[in-house]
Amino acid sequence: MKNLENKSFIIRCLKAAASPSGVCRYGNTFSWLQLSFLFLFLTACLMAPLAVSFVKMDRFSVSSFMPSAIQGVNDQFADQLQGFQIRNGKLTGGKSSERIEDGQNVMAVDMKHEYETSGENGRLKVTGFENAIIFQPDQLVITDQNETGFSVGYAKMDVKLEKPNVHDVEVLIDTLWLAQYKPMIMMLAYTVVSMIQLLLTFVLAGGLWITKISNMVSIASFKEAASIAICASALPAFAAAAIGMVHFDLITVLMIHSCGVTLMISFAFRYLTKTRRDNGNLHSGGNDDKSAVI
């Protein structure tokens, strides 16, 4: 053990991540501080393709969480937006100010702030309507009957709506929404990845540590179990990150990582049980020889 601990931290990390046997051999050579660093590093690796994907993303499908509001966009409303432009965070130009109201649905260009809103952002409501898409001079208000609603600023975009169609309007809404809420989406995605990584590590470490009760494996402490769980996730994390860089899909990345960690832990557990069995046979054989000599 001393010889293993004398090796540099990087060498131990590489050897621990290379194979299930390395995971077991070097599992007890890391301190809690080093394990924390490894955990954060591997979590960052999983987040790398996510960050690259967000950098490339220029719009987010609002219809995925506000379907009823977006489905209401039609050619008549697209024609109303003809001639308007967004510049320096303001909506200007255009001539039409007709409202399209149908029961609890409304779509309008409201240059005089005639529609009243209530509630906080994310749960915003337009008084008297469930589904609303309202372009105002300084913001876009969009609400859905599922009680989701946002006010979206125009940021510093430079857009001129010459002959917009339904698709152009949907793309504009998607682009405006992402420009304002991209940091929120990124933070939410990072939190999900971190929590899944933490939960997976804790469950695997706890499972390994519990096997100590049955004497199936020779794990001395919870730290060693946590070390094995973290080191076993290194190779799957690198593989998931590499695949995510080529073609990103959050669910695919998490599945590759989770399945890979499970396989590595299975092989490591097999190695531990085999090592314990071999050691037991050696001790048993030694006692038999000693008895025979006596």
Swiss-Prot record:
Keywords: Cell membrane, Membrane, Transmembrane, Transmembrane helix. This is Putative maltodextrin utilization protein YvdJ. It is found in: Cell membrane. Coiled coil: none annotated. It is a multi-pass membrane protein. One of its GO terms (cellular component) is plasma membrane. The chain crosses the membrane at residues 35-55, 184-204, 228-248, 249-269. Could have a role in maltodextrin utilization.
